């Protein structure tokens, strides 16, 4: 697929999802398409991975499975992120955690890493810390949207501070692992995906603030 066309398609896809999920006539349809969007985005990241190899795909697979397993333990124990449970919106679940969650962690790590690489920051630890900061900032936007659309729900009224601390540490570990491979790149496609994630959830957050 032509890279320019693909970028435009992703922009239209996320814009349509943002608007469609808030229109009464289309909300149910577009909300049901969330898992497909996550699968498609992960597929694009794999197909257009800048340095494709068996080792690269093995690493990405391990990353996705490790992230999914972390969430399994988080849901099971309530000790990592806080007490929460997943709804039905994100699709098929294994051990009470959607398969798409591991894919989403994968997408967010490689996408936010591409932003960090573009900024030419020295040192793997510094890059990992900034990448984790970007992912945690994104989680601040995701949380109210996730609860509204039944991605997941928390046992309490407020999202626990523990969640954001754990998000940063988990993201830092995944970013640092990624930094210690030859795979990080300044992929413009991955940077676009990162930007779309921020804009998508910022848009949802604004819609919810104004009760749209």
Where would I find each of the regions flagged by the language model?
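Aromatic-rich, lipid-facing transmembrane alpha helices and their immediate juxtamembrane interface loops
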Residues: 1-212
């Amino acid at each position: 697929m032509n890279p320019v066309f693909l970028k435009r398609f992703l922009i239209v896809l996320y814009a349509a999802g943002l608007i469609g999920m808030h229109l009464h006539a289309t909300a149910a349809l577009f909300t049901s398409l969330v898992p497909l969007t996550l699968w498609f985005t992960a597929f694009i990241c794999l197909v257009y991975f800048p340095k494709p190899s068996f080792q690269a795909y093995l690493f990405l697979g391990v990353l996705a499975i490790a992230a999914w397993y972390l969430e399994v333990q988080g849901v099971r124990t309530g000790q990592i992120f806080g007490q929460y449970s997943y709804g039905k919106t994100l699709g098929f679940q294994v051990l009470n955690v959607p398969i798409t969650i591991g894919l989403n962690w994968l997408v967010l790590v490689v996408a936010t890493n591409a932003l960090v690489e573009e900024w030419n920051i020295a040192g793997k630890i510094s890059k990992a810390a900034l990448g984790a900061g970007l992912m945690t900032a994104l989680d601040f936007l995701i949380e109210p949207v996730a609860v509204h659309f039944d991605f997941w729900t928390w046992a309490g009224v407020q999202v626990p501070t523990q969640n954001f601390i754990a998000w940063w540490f988990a993201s830092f570990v995944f970013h640092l692992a990624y930094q210690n491979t030859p795979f990080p790149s300044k992929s413009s496609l991955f940077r676009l995906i990162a930007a779309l994630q921020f804009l998508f959830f910022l848009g949802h957050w604004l819609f919810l603030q104004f009760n749209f």
